Amino acid sequence: MRLLHLAAVTTAFALSVVTTLAWAWTGGVDELGIPLPYSHPGASGPGSAADGSPTVHVDPSNGWIDPTAPEPGVPAVPDQGLPGRPTTAAPSTAGPDRRPHPAPPVRNPSCRTGEKLVPTCGILWGVAPGAFTEQRGAVALAAFERKTERHQDIYHAYHRGEKQLFPTKEEIGIARERGRERLLFLNWKPVGASWEEIAEGDKKTDAYLDRLAKHIRKNYREQFFFTVHHEAEDNVREKSGSGYTADDYAKMYRHVVKRLRARGVDNLVTVLVHMAYVPHTTKSWFDRMYPGDDVVDWIGFDTYAYSDPGYGHGDLTELLNRRMGSRPTWPGFYNWAVNRHADKPLMVAEWGVWSSKKNPGHKAGFYRDMARQIPRFKNIRAMVHFDTPHNQKGMDSRVDATRESLAAYRRLGHLPIFQVEVDNALS
């Protein structure tokens, strides 16, 4: 991976004002949309076991998915006459939808969030709405819920730096909406100090964390998901003294979580969010990014599907267990995670299907296939769609790219497996 040096600015500042270009392979993006000074290597680049990347051993008893195994023959929900994959796109209608909110779906009373917000059964369903647009927050969430005709269990929001405290008043309102309560997933990326500096007690960062802890204790006592610097793989620089080694990240993550908890923030449920980009996950430093079981409650990963043949083109199994010919020892992220973190629930923290004018029917087909495939992935306990009309390269992940894709996504969201009663109160 090449590093584009930015003259006349310090390394810490340069990394503080950029976001990860995860869209290139996983699609993960920061809502601010500032380009990161890194570029990804091609899919055929070096990095196989022969060049030092680790060999991963998996235990099938932990829930490992054999990609060659046939799928169960019975679909999770009847097709109900959904049209076949179209050959031409039906564009999404623009403009605000002013229809009333859809009623919350009928929940399975036996499926509800439990300890550390892990569902007793089923999978939490959520969204990061309106990314890379002016319409974010409650407005974007309401629009997404109207068009998909269901309530979202998780609302994913992004924060950076030391100026804004969270959850914000708007986010608290989203979580506490009467009869439509939601779980917050708050994503914080520190700026102004390197990982190493934060881990060693950077004064400015510590002062912010102390203010943040006071704010949370005073204003929000419900449980919420929390992550620190998601997709950090894209920022790792394995050079002594860089301040951004994998070990630096693990120590920084520990420092942030432990400082917040030491100051009374006992309601955060931590998610370590990986970038599921195969060349990164097979690096020798990848496992060293783990901060420790005591500060990580969930394992998350960001991954996106592509509608055109090539890298990332396929179904849900490909999305969750993406492999690469040049990295033959990598079993796929899901398989790796259930082996490496067998006792941790998994969250797909960002996912979506990039649209294509050449292959507009792929998105609807992906959602229909997903309905049959998702029950196989027993360790997935939450999925959060990243909904944007355009990422930094103009790629569209909206579920309503075509009429058929919206219909398929609506049916997907109403499957029994995605019906979980949200209870975010501290036990």
Predicted features along the sequence, with ranges:
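Aromatic-rich peripheral "rim/lid" segments of glycoside hydrolase catalytic domains that contact
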Residues: 6, 47, 52-67, 71, ...
